[in-house]
Amino acid sequence: MYQAIYIQQGENYAKTVHLKDDNEGWLHFDYKPTYYKLNPNGEFKTLDGKCVSPTDRYSKDNYEIDIPNETRVLIEQYLEEDEPPKWHNIVFLDIECEIGGALTPENIKNSPTKITSIALYDKSTQQTICYILDESKSMESFEENGKSIIACYTEKELLLKFLDKWEELEPTIVVGWNSEFFDIPYLYFRMLKVFDHNTAKRLSPLGIIGNLSKYGSVATVETQKLTKDYLDLAGINHLDYFNLFKKYITKQEPSYKLGDIGEKYVNLGKIKYEVSLDKLFKEDKAKFIDYNIRDVEILIELDKKLQFIELTLNICHLCHVPYENIYWSTMLNEGAILTYLKRQGIVSNNKPTTINPELRLTIGDEYAGGYLKDPIPGLYSDVIDLDFTSLYPSIIRSLNMGVETLIGNVKIRDKYDSNWTLLDLKALRPSEKITIENPKRQVTQITAGKLIEMIEKNKLTIAASGGLFRSDKRSVVCDVLSDWFDKRVEYKNMMKDAYKVKKDPVLGEFYNKRQHAFKIKLNDVYGCFAQNGWRYTDGYKVISNAITLTGQRLIKESILEMNRMINTEIGTEDVDYVITSDTDSMFIRVGDVVRYRWPDLDVSDRDARIAKILEIASDYQKQINKYLNKHVRDLFNIQDDHYFELKQEVILERGYFAGKRRYAQYIINKEGVTTEELDIKGLDLMKSNFPPLFRKFGENLIQQIMFGKQKKEIDLLISSFKKSIAGREIVEIAKPTGVKKIREYIERGPTASKIFSDLKSKAPINTKAAIYYNDLLRFKKLDKKYPTIKEFEKIYYVYLKDNPYRLDCIGFYGVDDPPEIIEFIEKYVDKEKTFDSTFLNKLQGVYDDLKWSFPSLNEYANKFFVIS
């Protein structure tokens, strides 16, 4: 099975394939792609039913002219194989360099400062190595606790020793954190500066460094300007764990710094230090080495727990694509479907943007998303949810959606118009004129009666958007989704058998990875339909709208039916029991139903109450699925099986809903199993740009509310916290931020008679703070000793009280700042204003949601509280 692939473009369209196989090693061969031309006697059929024959001559009228060559080769060479290779040489890497300004792409390309250390871990040998620059020759190389520390007296020596080891290890996969943006490009360009291209290209086993764009084209760095796209070390797969993490863990993290992620997920953070990193390097090399190695150790522990590398390999081999394609669902799903069709002997169509290049200009056209019901903000108890199982894949399969089954659509009024189901058509006057269009965008009018007749006679399915699909043949996307569903079920059963019957955890984990790969693929197909350049979409987002608007209609109809059922049962009228809904789920408060069905139940008996709530959830799940079974057939004219099903997932003891996708949930039962979980998302109290102290307190405050603390206790927590602010270090309460623009907001710089710059009227607070810091640094003649704040750097800022300079705010780095400036900030920092401007309105927002009166936090009020 393949481990790496690189295709080298030669002269006159000649191509050389470099393919590394786990059994045969490196294979090198010339390659010419195969296209397919129309031929009434051709031995192959296309997806749209035409006869074709193979040819190696390019023509814009041929089929399969725009398939990436890497995908072509991998499908041809490994058509019947989906498994990952038996082995890989995986190396984890982290580099450190002297501080030399903001890490912009241009600065990385210029690579102005020395690389001071390189830490790596070879997974095959479990060997950790750190190459450390020691120009003072104060240390010798040594081994300790299984780690090799290699002292290098010049940067050249460090880089050459690293390259020697790199070539010895022969990595097939290199892993870092944000290494796509920084480590690998900086390493290459620094080698280019210190040595030459011949030395720098040793990073690639093929001696080729390419700049791989995110759309698959490759050019050498000599002919293409460095952009934010990553450098391609030809012959080595570069998997940036930062990007993998953001792909697989879709919930927003407060911070994506490696140390913060490490602490949260594997209880392993960065090595702490009190000075700047440059100063640490000069004054404490042992700690600096530990700092460098720790970054690699965090990566190792993250992958041990999350196993994203193994998951990536499983997905990419299922799809027959290079590993770097893992971030783009269109490439993955295109590869998977091409493989499926090739196994059937079917030739694929070209991309819509190849057939009609003008579609590239409409790539940003909008389409409707999922329906989110606005909650009435508040704290709710005894809440259940009902979730659609794989809603979007189920819509695609149930309505047989696909580019080859789409026959046309109703011309809708706007992207939210979801009232074109068969039931909607039947509610119109039969003579009412409706505008419809075919896949070629040709428009005509038809009466509602004639359209209904056409739908029913031809057994067409109709989406909520008015998209029309034939049902006499299955779309290839539906076939692939069905195949993936079946395989996922098969692997899940094999996983359970391995764990429970065979007692083989290794085999169980193997099957678990396989089923997880299929789960991910099932859930990301629908998004590809919105990409005009995806091979299996219509190019005009007709299918995308059909999917999302049908999803909207289903969740809305389900909400109406759920409210009708509860109101009917307990005798209320028009009461909304559905608190909120997301794209595929709804949260329902059932406390009134519990009290109605069991008026004598002791609600303080938690286990008894949960049992009754589970009974209610099971009952309503059966009722609403029975309703859906008939209703979806009437709505969408589904003749055969459909795949729509609502399932109860969780029970919340309490749920705080502040707005769309902004909530805290105290989960006490998950899929019928008792649990104790807090799920918090999107709340203002926990924003990533909050001071860490405030963010931590906000999280604790929400937890206490969810665990049932009363208002008086919450009041006391807030009052006590505000009082404690006075004794906190400034870095704890300062607001962390980035600075994007500095020069743009300076009207006039300082003069001999004026210390501070004149700023433009709309200068943001963080920019003002940075400029004032720089001006004060220069005024105190400290700018030769300490760096000024530059654009794109991370800083902190605070508000100031009345001070001799009449500044209202000031920024600082938070590490290794001049004592003179820190002394000034500590003397004049306005901690109360910092608290009020950053945090107070967020706290008041929570109280407003909970219908609580906000406590007075002044000193007079504090005497009524006992604060330890």
Task: Please annotate each region the language model reported.
Residues 1-170, 294, 298-317, 321, ...:
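DnaQ-like (DEDDh/DEDDy) 3′-5′ exonuclease domain used for proofreading
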Residues 128-130, 138-141, 146-149, 153, ...:
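Active-site-proximal helix-loop-helix substrate-binding element of RNase H-like nuclease domains
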Residues 143-149, 168-172, 281-287, 318, ...:
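Glycine- and acidic
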Residues 162-186:
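Proline-aspartate-enriched helix->loop->beta-strand connector
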Residues 586-620:
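Catalytic palm subdomain of template-directed nucleic-acid polymerases
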Residues 614-868:
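C-terminal, non-catalytic extensions of nucleic-acid polymerases
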